[in-house]
């Protein structure tokens, strides 16, 4: 298969290099199109106000001065001279569990692939303090999942969010299909002073686990399993449709009220 690989940790990150090499060893044709620096937390942002510069590192690698979503968008809308078959994003050097997917550039790169018509997988290694020891485990998991997707495709609106415990392959207890868990609200932002005495802020850490019981991605990884969460991008809250529909009469009447 022709595999487009991207990430949010940057084109020089070890995770993406190990992933690309593992996919090549498995017989895939791999093109890496990734940010020229760390763009973690970029979510689904596209660069629309300035042109995006790219730099070919070699025949199989391109660095992009943009977000993960920019990378996949450019690669799939004309920058490459061929059409990939699948998008694989990662390997992220930290978890993308539960609410993390909202902010994750890793997941968003996969999501852009899905928007543009390709199967897509996001792969993250659940590390402690970003100190990764077993990228090769996550890479092997990705290779196995890509093979399964080729043999048994999923519905066209499905993205796979994969989180891998930072363990040797032999120590992983298995794969689990999971749902997204939830975190408590984020920790407070951290104020500091710059050299001129002006207040600046750091975004605080993600909140601790809240909904993290059996069946969630949090629980699977915590118990030594590789979590596979099928996700999609329909954000409609169907359970609220009837309630909001009940507002419509009053809202419509307000159109006739004096300004």
Swiss-Prot record:
Disulfide bonds: none annotated. InterPro entries: SurE, SurE-like_Pase/nucleotidase, SurE-like_sf. Binds 1 divalent metal cation per subunit. A divalent metal cation binds at residues 8-9, 40, 92. GO terms for cellular component: cytoplasm. It is an enzyme of class 3 (hydrolase). Its cofactor is a divalent metal cation. Its EC number is 3.1.3.5. Keywords: Cytoplasm, Hydrolase, Metal-binding, Nucleotide-binding. It catalyses: a ribonucleoside 5'-phosphate + H2O = a ribonucleoside + phosphate. GO terms for molecular function: 3'-nucleotidase activity; 5'-nucleotidase activity; exopolyphosphatase activity; metal ion binding; nucleotide binding. Coiled coil: none annotated. It is found in: Cytoplasm. Belongs to the SurE nucleotidase family. Nucleotidase that shows phosphatase activity on nucleoside 5'-monophosphates. This is 5'-nucleotidase SurE.
């Amino acid at each position: 298969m022709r595999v487009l690989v991207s990430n949010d940790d940057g084109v020089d990150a070890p995770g993406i290099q190990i992933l690309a090499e593992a996919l090549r060893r498995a017989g895939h044709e791999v093109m890496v199109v990734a940010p020229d620096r760390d763009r973690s937390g970029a979510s689904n942002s596209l660069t629309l106000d300035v042109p995006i510069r790219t730099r070919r590192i070699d025949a199989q690698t391109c660095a992009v001065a943009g977000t993960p979503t920019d990378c996949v968008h450019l690669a799939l809308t004309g920058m490459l001279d061929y059409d990939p078959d699948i998008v694989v994003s990662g390997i992220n050097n930290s978890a993308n569990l539960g609410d993390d997917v909202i902010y994750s550039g890793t997941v968003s790169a996969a999501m852009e692939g899905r928007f543009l018509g390709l199967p897509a997988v996001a792969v993250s290694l659940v590390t402690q303090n970003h100190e990764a020891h077993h990228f090769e485990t996550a890479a092997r998991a990705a290779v196995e999942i890509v093979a399964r997707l080729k043999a048994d495709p999923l519905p066209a609106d499905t993205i796979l969010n994969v989180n891998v415990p930072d363990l040797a392959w032999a120590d992983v207890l298995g794969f689990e299909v999971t749902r997204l868990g939830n975190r408590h609200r984020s920790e407070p932002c951290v104020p500091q002073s710059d050299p001129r005495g002006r207040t600046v802020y750091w975004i605080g850490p993600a909140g601790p686990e809240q909904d993290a019981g059996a069946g969630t991605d949090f629980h699977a990884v915590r118990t030594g399993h590789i979590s596979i969460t099928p996700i999609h991008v329909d954000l409609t809250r169907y359970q609220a449709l009837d309630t909001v529909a009940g507002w419509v009469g009053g809202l419509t009447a307000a159109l006739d009220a004096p300004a």
